[in-house]
Amino acid sequence: MSYSVQNIRNVCLLGHSGNGKTALAESLLYMTGAIDRMGRGADGNTVCDYDPEETKRQISISTAVAPLEYKGCRINVLDTPGAFDFAGEVIEALRAADAAIIVCSAKDGVSVGLEKAWKYCEERNMPRFIYISKTDEDNSDYNATFEALRARFGNKIAPLVVPIWDEGKKVTGIIDVLNKRAYEMQDQKRVEIEIPEGKDAVIEEFNNALKESVAETSEEFMDKFFGGEDFTYAEMIQGLRQGVRELSLFPVLCGSAVNCMGSLMLLDDIVDLLPNPMEGNYHKATRQDGETEPFVVSPGGVPTAFVFKTVSDQYGKYSFVKVLSGTLTPDLPMVNARTGVSEKLGRLYTMRGKKATEVKELGCGDIGAIGKMEKVKTGDTLCDARKVVALKELPFAEPCYSVAIVPKTRGQEDKIAQGLARMNEEDPTFSVTNNAETHQMVLNGSGDMQVDVLVSKLKSRFNVEADLKPVRVPYREKIRKTVQKQGRHKKQTGGSGQFGDVWIRFEPQTEQDDMIFAEEVFGGSVPKNFFPAVEKGLREACAHGPLAGYPVVNLKAVLYDGSYHPVDSYEIAFKTAAQLAYKAALPEANPVLLEPVGELKVTVPDSYMGDVIGDLNKRRGRVMGMDPTGDGNQVISAEVPMAEMGSYAIDLRSMTQSRGSFTFHFVRYEDCPPAAQEKAIAEAKALQAAEEK
């Protein structure tokens, strides 16, 4: 069934891990008849947590789409992970959604996940509800949670639903503040009850607060309010809807997903108060000439869709899209704005968890999936050839956690690379680099949990087991003293022999990293035709320094004397002689290890500044400055040796309760302090010994 854009709601569920987002989605599906039995995360049978990794870990690790129908509207629920390693999935869902429901637990109050979700919405000017979950569980405290929300986010927080307690402080029902009606659940069915004694005054207070919010949405309503006239129900809905859209009102609802308490009221408010796709996020598009323009969501426009997510598994590839203009149909030719290539659409589907239902079309504003679009990737814009525009790519955070990945069985490096490449189609937030210098395949991600999931999927989906090891630091070596040495190579094994003799002066230089080769030979002691062989031998030798085998930089080598044999001198002999001179000279040239140093920018709340700066000092970091961001955070700029950054992503998360974030980029090489140099040399020699076994 196709829905008009006015009757579509695209809503993402955000919040801290474990606060009940997936359970809420399950409850909404059940109450609308989309499923006939509610699953449980502990049983591994929910609609949205269908991946084997989610079942095993009992957490969400990817965004799932769960469409349902209610009161003539199609509601596309996007259930997102709360674990911060999978924030990329949240970024994808936010692009497809037109509004958010931030789920927080009555047991935990204002959590880090809630704060991050709120910030995501603020950055996008996204309308939002707050849903207080688990109100009926032991140790829950709705009042404390609500007051914490008010204290954190201000008086724009407005309750639409409040719980009812019995004498033992157990939640038994809820009250609809707008309609002043009370309900309880009996066998997962909503039953209206009388408003308990003593609640009337509180409900009246909240109801009047809603009326004040409505009055502020227009002059007409303001005049009516101060004139003492009551608003009709339709006017209340109109005003509340406008307040939600204009971000002057953030309704708070509550309930329990386990027994579906509050779920129908939430559905009512989704339909009545949240925007449809034409009223949702403002989009900017880049034309082919490079100019930007506002993108207007239009049912009658040329077909345009944004690919916000990709699923690629053993059953095939699905490109999840939000239709932003026109209507999509199978076999419709569309141009990929990124590549300029035209490709016919495959079959179209609506997805409910892992269940794909084929459809004949996807209308404007709707969310669905296209099958087998092999050249399409997450972040692409698919357009009609008459109007090719590119919407802004998804703003994924840079990977901040790196490990080396190696197969448990030798020879399976290609299998690991192929498996990671397939999974990178689904999860573009991680990257893989092959470091030619350290001979490591490096996996860069958001944190240890994401990396652990990737390794687990390599085994389950691609039948290859992998180990994780620390990333080796790419040190350099240089000399600090000028030394001159002879290199003499003579080999006689019968017949023609090999002879090469050179004197080379090795000295430090600061002009460039690469070796500078020069010659000061007089009188033909070394023929010019052997100069290239000498230079080649030296450049090859520079790949391994005298201290720990790291590349040598800032070196100047001057060939100034030598001798040759008219019969036995060949290029290979002079190449070998040059390398002998190098090996003899550099250990005497006061060599030193250079370590890579990077620029670190850490964003943390003010309250964690002392801990973070103290930790940077322990990592031999130099704090260069601190800048307030204006929202209670500070950006600390520092220079830190790369060797000290291996576990920083995990350590910062622990120090700041996941409130901190950082970027780190290489800047330059610096002399390594003696203690750090000794440690690096010992590690390099131990690694070399292990590889020789």
Q: Predicted regions span which residues?
A:
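Structural and coupling elements of P-loop NTPases
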Residues: 1-693
